[in-house]
Design a protein with these regions (language model features):
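His/Asp/Glu-enriched, well-ordered alpha-helical/loop segment
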Residues: 1-4, 9, 14-21, 25, ...
């Protein structure tokens, strides 16, 4: 079933991350915020907190279960690929970006865990629901990616 989670978790410091990990709380940040709200963070977040602002890498490093989401329809770009690009290439501070495997895990397995459905979703394995997207481009060049096909419940959406 549903799990305890903190949506956004945008200004978490080391003490908050450790406490969340110890309590088994799932972090659900929105990487698209790094792209879409960057000017607001640069203008309003105090310098001493800036590098902790949506520090996705720190969430993984703290040992949290992390599930990425889009926060749609609040954001203009309800597009996981924009969020993926931001997680990989657009941290607010150098060194806070996450790796490709972490980002894909957070959008798939992490998201399934966060919604309490990891027994059905989040993996391409026998017995799991067949929900996935096929991407064109290079995963190592996220700006080149586009969705070429989606499949939901085993049915392709052409």
């Amino acid at each position: 079933g549903p799990r305890h989670r903190i949506e956004h978790f945008g200004l978490a410091g080391p003490e908050h991350l450790a406490k969340a990990r110890d309590l088994g709380i799932i972090a659900v940040p929105q990487p698209v915020f790094l792209n879409e709200l960057r000017a607001n963070y640069e203008r309003y977040v105090p310098d001493q907190w800036f590098c902790r602002c949506f520090n996705l890498k720190a969430m993984f490093d703290a040992g949290l279960t992390v599930a990425f989401s889009s926060d749609g329809p609040v954001v203009r770009q309800v597009d996981p690929l924009v969020g993926l690009r931001a997680a990989l290439k657009e941290p607010l501070c150098a060194g806070n970006e996450v790796g490709l495997e972490q980002a894909l895990w957070a959008y798939t397995t992490g998201a399934a865990i966060a919604q309490g459905d990891e027994g059905n979703r989040g993996r391409l394995e026998a017995g799991y629901w067949t929900d996935f997207v096929m991407l064109e481009g290079s995963l190592h060049e996220p700006e080149s990616l586009s969705v070429s096909r989606t499949t939901v419940g085993g049915t392709p959406d052409l």
